[in-house]
Amino acid sequence: MLAALVVVYEMRMRSEGLQSVSPQGLIRLMNQGALVLDLRPAEQYQAGHLNGARQMSSEQIVSAGDTLKKHKEKTVVVYDDSGSLGGAAVRQLAAQGFTRVFALRGGLAAWRADNLPLSRA
């Protein structure tokens, strides 16, 4: 079921000209200093998130240009549980002048499926 959702999500992202990244690709981007934004509610973020990720709700993304303006030239990656909010967040950030924005393909579910670690801090 997850695989089917990931395929549908990926097709939608591509048809809209949006970029996504696999969990392994995200690790490379994180090692290069990417800004990672967790779109989930604060309670879910506190229960476990990607190391170094910053919690920012999808509502806050609408005005992220002000909050994150010093990061506009950095690579930014967004994620939620399933990847369903990633496309909208990528579009919002791109509209605000962010030039390298990606969504985590399959969201945190894909990260967990690859048995990758989470932080709880």
Task: Give the ranges of each region predicted by the language model.
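Rhodanese-like catalytic fold shared by cysteine-dependent sulfurtransferases
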Residues: 1-24, 29-34, 42-75, 81-121
